[in-house]
Amino acid sequence: MQLGFAMLADPILLITILLGFAMAWAIGANDAANSMSTAVGAGAITPRQAVIIAGVLEFMGAYFFGKTVTETIRKGIIDPSKITDPNVLIFGSIAALIGATIWLVIATKYGLPVSTTHSIIGGIVGYGIVYGGMSIVNWDKMIKVVLSWILSPIVGAIFAYLVFRALSKTVLQSKDPVKSAKRWSPFWIGLAFVVIGTMFYIKVLHGNSLLEGFLKYGMPAGILTFIVVSLILEKRFPATDPYLGAERVFRRVQVITSAYVALAHGANDVANAIGPVAAVYTVAMFGLAGAKVPVPRWILALGGLGIAIGVATYGYKVMETVGKKITELTNTRGFTIDFSAATVVLIASWLGMPISTTHTVVGAVIGVGLARGIKAINKDIVKDIIISWFVTVPAAGVIAGIIFKALMMLMG
């Protein structure tokens, strides 16, 4: 449906559209910046190249692969059956957007990578408690969210630590690095593309069968990549220094893995910005309220554009934190982080475990750093990041609760 005069004449809907765009911008500045942080930190691409690539792919992911039906209340975190008044859903959505956006802007200002999903959940819980008390919150779901704070970075760190140790042993520290790099690099890169292909089916195309994704996309992508990389390395190893040669092999691949992360992020996390907009749009235009609502393409475009602009204008702060401040990254370390984070998220999706991509990426960065010893980690930065994770839900919730209360009193 096109943006008509009647729609634009509705001030509440117009405000919600602007807030949704602001939230999308904040997602781009914070969460989307994660997709390119390791590539920038390892020197695979420049920050300018990173924001262009991330911006284009985030928009493509949101517009072409974003879900056309979204939840009005993310993750079923509060009971929608207890919200019978459409005005509550409208003002609650506005309050949740404001709460989440303000917190994301604060976190981004200090270069802290936080979860946008947790931010919008915090906003929803905040207005939900103000409206219906503690009983309106689905505490079983909330416990799963809290568990994801703990599980995501730990699992990401352990997996990345083990992968990097294995990669170092097979490629970087062998007796004949050139021979080992030619033999093992295609294996590791092919394995990464098995995960990427399968994840593309699950996360971007929103498929339900992990086995189908593995057979249709993952396995063919992995085998093809293995063959291509093997042929290239057999003909020409890209350096006289074997260590630098191995790093250059993984540099090219790291750009591809980071680009995939950006595409998948746009497809998935755009819902955090446009879900509340779609809810208000449906109520305003059709007088309908429900647990799920259709999402017009123009709303997906709005979200994708906001994310792209957010990456381009303010994404450098979080990129710098994740890519440079936690630990020193090389191309093999950056590849390990992307591969580990994607694999952990894929396995978690298969098992139905709650997991945060942001927390997993940061955990993987820490794990790679720990593989070189505890002194390789900037402990002060890690401490600040962990504190920000635990503050995210309550901070967004308190802001949203105050905004919701003020709106309800104002509109009487």
UniProtKB/Swiss-Prot annotation:
<keyword id="KW-0592">Phosphate transport</keyword>
<dbReference type="GO" id="GO:0035435">
    <property type="term" value="P:phosphate ion transmembrane transport"/>
</dbReference>
<dbReference type="GO" id="GO:0005886">
    <property type="term" value="C:plasma membrane"/>
</dbReference>
<feature type="transmembrane region" description="Helical">
    <location>
        <begin position="7"/>
        <end position="27"/>
    </location>
</feature>
<feature type="transmembrane region" description="Helical">
    <location>
        <begin position="187"/>
        <end position="207"/>
    </location>
</feature>
<feature type="transmembrane region" description="Helical">
    <location>
        <begin position="143"/>
        <end position="163"/>
    </location>
</feature>
<keyword id="KW-0812">Transmembrane</keyword>
<keyword id="KW-1003">Cell membrane</keyword>
<keyword id="KW-0472">Membrane</keyword>
<feature type="transmembrane region" description="Helical">
    <location>
        <begin position="50"/>
        <end position="70"/>
    </location>
</feature>
<feature type="transmembrane region" description="Helical">
    <location>
        <begin position="384"/>
        <end position="404"/>
    </location>
</feature>
<feature type="transmembrane region" description="Helical">
    <location>
        <begin position="119"/>
        <end position="139"/>
    </location>
</feature>
<protein>
    <recommendedName>
        <fullName>Putative phosphate permease PF1020</fullName>
    </recommendedName>
</protein>
<comment type="similarity">
    <text>Belongs to the inorganic phosphate transporter (PiT) (TC 2.A.20) family.</text>
</comment>
<feature type="transmembrane region" description="Helical">
    <location>
        <begin position="213"/>
        <end position="233"/>
    </location>
</feature>
<comment type="function">
    <text>Potential transporter for phosphate.</text>
</comment>
<dbReference type="Pfam" id="PF01384">
    <property type="entry name" value="PHO4"/>
</dbReference>
<feature type="transmembrane region" description="Helical">
    <location>
        <begin position="298"/>
        <end position="318"/>
    </location>
</feature>
<keyword id="KW-1133">Transmembrane helix</keyword>
<feature type="transmembrane region" description="Helical">
    <location>
        <begin position="88"/>
        <end position="108"/>
    </location>
</feature>
<feature type="transmembrane region" description="Helical">
    <location>
        <begin position="335"/>
        <end position="355"/>
    </location>
</feature>
<dbReference type="InterPro" id="IPR001204">
    <property type="entry name" value="Phos_transporter"/>
</dbReference>
<keyword id="KW-0813">Transport</keyword>
<dbReference type="GO" id="GO:0005315">
    <property type="term" value="F:phosphate transmembrane transporter activity"/>
</dbReference>
